[in-house]
């Protein structure tokens, strides 16, 4: 039997274990793309008997990690499995998790988010139900969607999740005297490199590339370098993806077809304005320095005409 949401009686218990799932899942940030981040907790009575999370793309999913690393496998029968995404029921790089859950006679599955991927999308629930496993859905649903916002945007909107990022002075200038200049404190440069490891790709326009010849690597933080993209006609080095000058919508469609789930845009004013005016972005990350320049290249200034409820904006 499938229940649409958790009952009020068990809500606090379900939320406690689901929050643990989300915490475990978050360890996969930047490592599992383009897969979603998933964590799993298995409970027998009031005791956690196993945990796991999806650690790297191509490796075992969270449910399989938890089940196969359970120190007392005989206790899995009749247990409750918490997972923040609908278990898969198809063969991909790894076997289906739903089959393993059925095989180990787990009694109940509690889920945070449905999986919109057409290869799953309810089929995991069906497999569990047909085996007589009770399924409870939508526990901490909004928190789960936020954690996997890249995945859900990619699946539902068929484009990468887009983050616009720039640095500006205290009075809103990107560069004094229109010249490249490092505005913020050194530790924020490290933060910028950390952010790069979390996204699949990074993009600049041809103007920024010609002026700055940026490396766009994550050399100050441990993790994978993003795919480096330049938009426009330049002589880009090997290892970069060069895309022709085209609309933002067409650019994002091209990246979607290349299975690029998320994108951070670190271009200059022109390319940032193009994304802002298109409305095809999800976050704005602004690193604000302490200095006042009084003149120079003004930073973008999204207004109420370009902001919609799905955009998230914050300052660091």
Write out the residue ranges for each language-model feature.
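Short capping loops/turns at secondary-structure boundaries
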Residues: 117, 121, 137-140, 155-159, ...
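Proteins enriched for Cys/Gly/acidic motifs involved in redox and nucleic-acid/cofactor modification
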Residues: 31-32, 125, 139-167
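Zn2+-dependent cytidine deaminase-like catalytic core
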Residues: 42-143, 227, 234, 274-276
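N-terminal glycine-rich anion-binding loops that anchor highly charged ligand groups
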Residues: 32-46
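Enzymes that bind and transform nitrogen-containing heteroaromatic metabolites
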Residues: 2-36, 70-75, 93, 160-316
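Short, hinge-like loop/turn segments at secondary-structure boundaries
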Residues: 126-130, 153-155, 219-222, 301-303
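Short, flexible helix/strand-to-coil boundary loops that buttress conserved ligand/catalytic motifs
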Residues: 113, 148, 178
